[in-house]
Amino acid sequence: MKDSFLFTSESVTEGHPDKMADQISDAVLDYIIERDKKAKVACETLVSNGFCMITGELKTSVYAPMQEIAREVVKKIGYTDALYGFDYRSAAVLNGIGEQSPDINQGVDREDGEIGAGDQGLMFGYACKETETLMPLPIHLAHQLAFALAQKRKDNTLPFLRPDGKSQVSVRYENNKPVSVDTIVISTQHSPEVSQKHLKEAVIEEIVYKVLPKEYLHDNIKFFINPTGKFVIGGPQGDAGLTGRKIIVDTYGGFCPHGGGAFSGKDPSKVDRSAAYAARYVAKNLVASGVCDKATVQLAYAIGVIEPVSIYVNTHNTSKHSSAELEKCVKSVFKLTPKGIIESLDLLRPIYSLTSAYGHFGRELEEFTWEKTNKVEEIKAFFKR
């Protein structure tokens, strides 16, 4: 008997209010880290009806023009007209940034040059063989649909689309392998004059059919395109947005556990971010090396402590090696102290705006060093000893 089930993941466009907040926070981080690699940044953003508030803590000598940074992000996303409910020119931008607590900093920057973890916490990474990027298929497709919504809007293929939008994909699995797409949900902000019939047909033809691989298409896919009907009021006018509210969208679409820490606006001394990238790096290289077909990796840290307090590897019964053997391999091959992660992944660069929409993982951009599979040979060599 086939073991059959549905699994669902969602994504959001760059114009979703929570993603707007993430992008502003990461733009602030990029501006500062480009000018001060030793800066400590924890930037949180709120966007709401007609205003944006930037808050958090900094330790840096760099002056960051918060208004200019925020307005440029909002402009790039596409909120360029008050008719969209938010306009980069007229929105108020409030600055509530403060200084980082010296109590925190004393445990992070050490006299011996090492870096203590910026906080306690647990982080997860995941990889599997469902896609070429070693990501689960549902979140992979959801991101592609959300990205296509934005691209078709920006290139005027679908000029009636507006910036806010969401996608959701339900995939049918048989014996733990994806076999077909069952349901597609897309909600997209739009101009008031377009009919729901035209919008649905255009989204299916220009986005869904051009994104989904042919092997997963069939005549019985269920489509829910703007299922509540009109979606004219969107963005911060429709919902407030906050940094760090899309942590499942940012990671694996619910396919593996999440430690709870968000990424955007945090410099890499914060292990919430850097160790999550490292955990993905470990998991992806384990799968790419062939020692397993899927891997969940957990790392855990204590504030001010250099080494991780625990490393856990679960290959979901797809490896001939034990968890203890895999843990020894990970410790031997990867540098998992905060400093080791920052140096091996070259994280003191202004790369974070690129991560802040459409997923931090599974996108093989040159800047995303944690997506490289350059540890495969070392892993293979470890198990040949």
Swiss-Prot record:
InterPro entries of this UniProt entry?
A: ADOMET_SYNTHASE_CS (IPR022631), S-AdoMet_synt_C (IPR022630), S-AdoMet_synt_central (IPR022629), S-AdoMet_synt_N (IPR022628), S-AdoMet_synthetase (IPR002133), S-AdoMet_synthetase_sfam (IPR022636)
Q: Binding of K(+): at which residues?
A: 44
GO annotations of cellular component type: cytoplasm
Q: Which Pfam families match?
A: S-AdoMet_synt_C, S-AdoMet_synt_M, S-AdoMet_synt_N
CDD domains per the UniProt record, alphabetical: S-AdoMet_synt
The catalysed reaction is: L-methionine + ATP + H2O = S-adenosyl-L-methionine + phosphate + diphosphate
Record's subcellular location: Cytoplasm
Gene Ontology MF: a single term: magnesium ion binding
Q: Record's HAMAP family?
A: S_AdoMet_synth1
Query: How is this protein organized at the quaternary level?
Result: Homotetramer; dimer of dimers.
Q: Which family does it belong to?
A: Belongs to the AdoMet synthase family.
Q: What is this protein called?
A: S-adenosylmethionine synthase
- Organism the protein comes from: Helicobacter pylori (strain J99 / ATCC 700824)
Encoded by which gene? metK
